[in-house]
């Protein structure tokens, strides 16, 4: 199937707040979508809705873990803060979370350390391999797989995903790797959202 190029008008109709960066991202997105067969308006609309939500309409390419509310931290990051593994937020856990407020690096190392190829909390891998790009590639193992697919050294240079070209390519690779175009073809929009964000955060926004 021939690639149907995305136009600036179409991109701004879906993501109106991306106007300041549209000149950088339009060619990058066209290259990425052509490479990974996001090649119909239905596929493109679904893809753009997802990356628009994940990246605040192409304006946020690196995850911020700067929080000021300890209870919110304990609620969001069960892996690092459900200390007694009971599935509830307890006062002791909220108190423990206070030590991670207003410190993105410390919090990332806590919640992402020791998982999916990351070294332990003290290694710094949690922050090094935090979510980046338009769809939030996270963890050493996913950086490695994505880098191998794209032919770029993402493990050694994870910050490459903060550049428009690789931010777009990594998102399109993730889409292709999870067979999300098939779901878009079938109109399974919630199924796509579940793959990208299992908690369903922002589902209504993605549908707009």
Please name every model-derived segment.
Residues 9, 27, 31, 45-48, ...:
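Solvent-exposed, polar/charged alpha-helical surfaces in well-ordered, non-transmembrane soluble domains
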Residues 166-170, 177-184:
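Proteins synthesized as precursors that undergo proteolytic processing into mature forms
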Residues 34-39, 156-162, 184-185:
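Short, mixed-charge amphipathic alpha-helical segments
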Residues 51-54, 184-203:
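Acidic helix/loop microenvironments that form the catalytic cleft of cell-wall polysaccharide enzymes
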Residues 13-46, 196:
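N-terminal carbohydrate-binding/catalytic regions of secreted carbohydrate-active enzymes
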Residues 37-47, 60-64, 181-193:
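Surface-exposed patches in mature extracellular/periplasmic domains of secreted proteins
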Residues 2-24, 52-173:
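Peptidoglycan-targeting cell-wall enzymes and recognition modules
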């Amino acid at each position: 199937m021939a690639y149907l190029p995305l136009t600036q008008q179409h991109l701004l109709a879906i993501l109106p707040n991306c106007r300041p960066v549209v000149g950088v991202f339009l060619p990058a997105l066209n290259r990425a979508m052509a490479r990974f067969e996001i090649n119909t308006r239905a596929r493109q609309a679904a893809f753009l809705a997802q990356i628009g939500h994940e990246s605040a309409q192409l304006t946020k390419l690196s995850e911020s873990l700067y929080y000021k509310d300890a209870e919110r931290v304990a609620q969001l990051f069960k892996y690092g803060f459900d200390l007694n593994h009971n599935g509830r937020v307890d006062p002791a856990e909220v108190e423990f979370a206070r030590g991670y407020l207003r410190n993105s690096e410390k919090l990332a190392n806590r919640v992402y350390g020791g998982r999916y190829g990351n070294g332990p909390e003290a290694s710094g891998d949690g922050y090094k391999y935090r979510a980046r790009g338009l769809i939030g590639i996270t963890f050493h193992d996913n950086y490695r797989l994505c880098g191998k697919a794209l032919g770029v050294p993402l493990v050694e240079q994870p910050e490459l995903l903060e550049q428009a070209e690789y931010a777009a390519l990594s998102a399109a690779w993730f889409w292709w790797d999870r067979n999300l175009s098939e779901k878009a073809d079938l109109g399974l929009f919630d199924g796509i959202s579940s793959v990208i964000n299992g908690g369903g955060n922002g589902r209504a926004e993605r549908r707009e």
